[in-house]
């Protein structure tokens, strides 16, 4: 009984910190995707860099920008067989995206099946929308050997260009 109370208390106390770390990791991966070097940046600097360069945009599936929807209001649905994440509001599908001002780029969330799990990441396109600026993977359940390589720069650089 005491252990369960302590676990519940710890979970409650750490919830804000966990949410902060999830948001920080998201912002780090979006910034890394456009080539930002974050190695010397603390959390405050990362949030500041993100806020000054990245804006959230919501797109219809035809590519039109939707002005009156916040990305936080979209419900994500994961297709277990393909690993594809889809985003909905009132049963209408949208695509959350991000626009970088420096460097100019468009970033979209990506997901898909690997060998053992679904991989989640971000994919950045240069302004021409044809040239890949970068890719990052922030979540996967692949094995540490080959699967762990998706997080390494040498692997991610294979997609650039």
PLM regions: where:
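Flexible, solvent-exposed loop/hinge segments and secondary-structure transition points
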Residues: 1-161
């Amino acid at each position: 009984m005491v252990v369960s109370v302590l676990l519940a208390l710890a979970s409650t106390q750490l919830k804000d910190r966990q949410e902060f770390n999830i948001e920080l990791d998201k912002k780090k991966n979006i910034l890394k995707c456009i080539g930002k070097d974050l190695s010397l940046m603390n959390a405050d600097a990362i949030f500041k860099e993100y806020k000054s360069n990245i804006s959230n945009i919501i797109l219809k599936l035809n590519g039109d920008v939707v002005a009156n929807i916040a990305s936080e209001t979209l419900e994500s649905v994961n297709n277990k067989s393909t690993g594809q994440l889809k985003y909905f509001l009132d049963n209408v599908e949208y695509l959350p995206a991000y626009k970088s001002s420096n460097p100019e780029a468009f970033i979209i969330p990506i997901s898909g099946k690997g060998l053992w799990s679904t991989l989640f990441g971000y994919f950045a396109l240069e302004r021409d929308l044809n040239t890949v600026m970068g890719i990052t993977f922030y979540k996967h359940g692949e094995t540490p050997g080959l699967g762990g390589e998706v997080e390494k720069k040498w692997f991610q650089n294979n997609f650039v260009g």
